[in-house]
Amino acid sequence: MAITTDPSITSKSANCRGGDAIELSCIGEDGARYNARMYTPQAGIFALGTSSHTYLEFDILDVKKSKEFASTISAIREPRTTTGGVNFVIGFRPELWRDIVPEDAPPGVAGFNKEIQGKEGFVMPGTQHDALVWLSGSAYDVIFDMARSIVHDLAGQASLGEETASWSYQHDRDLTGFVDGSENPTLLDAPAAALLPEGFPGAAGSVLLLQKWKHKTTEWEALPIDQQERIMGRTKPDSIELENKPADSHVARTDQDEFGHIFRRNMPYGRVDDHGTMFVGFSADQKRLSGMLDSMAGLINGTRDALTRFTQPLTGSYYFVPSVETLRRLR
C-alpha cells in the first residue's frame, strides 16, 4: 500500500513509547488515517570521509546488571557527530539487546556464537562480545582521548575484550592495493540497504558484522598483478569487474545481486609486520551477511573464496545497532 501524508496535519515530536520519534499522521490509498513513527539511524553509520577509527568491544561483568550497562553505554555521548569531531556507533549483542528492549529487537538476529567451518579446513571464528563502540573522526588524538574516556566510564560494568585502531589507506583502498567497497550503494541508497524499515521492530537500526582479517602480505605481493585480479575478480588500477571472472573470485563469491545489498565501512588496521582489514558491514537483513560468509567459506556450492587463501579471519561478531531514539530511552 502506498502512503501519502496529509498536508493539513503537522508532524510533531511525540513523547511516546520508543523514544522521541517523529510521529506523522498519514492517509493510505484506502482513505484510512493512521499514525506512523519515524526513527533516526545513528549518524556514524554513514559518516564517510573519516580517516581515524577505533573499535572497542566490551564484555559485561555481571549479566544481572545488563540494563545498567546499557544505560551507561547509551549515555556516553549523543550517537551523532560531536563538537569534538568524533562519530559514535553503539551496538549490542543481538541476544543481549533482545533481553533489554525486546520490542525493538528484530526477530531471528543472532550473535556470531559459533565458528563457520568451511571447505579445506578453512575456519571463520566466532568471538562474540556483548557491546561495541565504534569511534571515527579525522584526528586520531581525539579518537584516542574519547576511547580512554569510554573505557573509564564503563569500568566496573564491563571489561574491554577487543580494541583495534584503523585508518584510511590511499583514499579508498585496502592493504591488498585494491579499491574496497566498489559495490557500495550511494549515500542516497545506503539507508535502504543498511536499515530496518519503519513499522518493523528495530526500525532505523542495523545489523552489523565486524570481523578482523589478517593479510598474508608476503604471499599476496609475490603474485603477479593479473593473478591478483583473477582472485579479486576486478582490475587493480580502476576496480572494473572482470567480464570472465573465475567462480572462486572474491567478487563472484560475494555477489550482492545474489545475496542482497549491504553497506560496507571497511578499514585497514595494524602494524608493518601484522596488518589487514577490519570488515564493517551493515545490513537490514542478517541473512545477507551470513550468506556471504557461507559462500566465502565454500558452504554454498563447494567453491571457496580464493581470497581466503591470502587472508585469515581472526575475529567475528554481530551487533544490533539501534536507532537514536531507542538509545535515548535507555539513559
Question: Where are these predicted regions, by residue range?
Answer:
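Ser/Thr-rich, low-complexity intrinsically disordered segments
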Residues: 1-13, 32
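A residue-level detector for conformationally permissive "hinge/kink" positions
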Residues: 10-11, 23, 268
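Short, positively charged and aromatic/hydrophobic N-terminal segments
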Residues: 21-22, 27, 33-34
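Long, histidine/aromatic-enriched segments associated with O2/redox biology
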Residues: 34-331
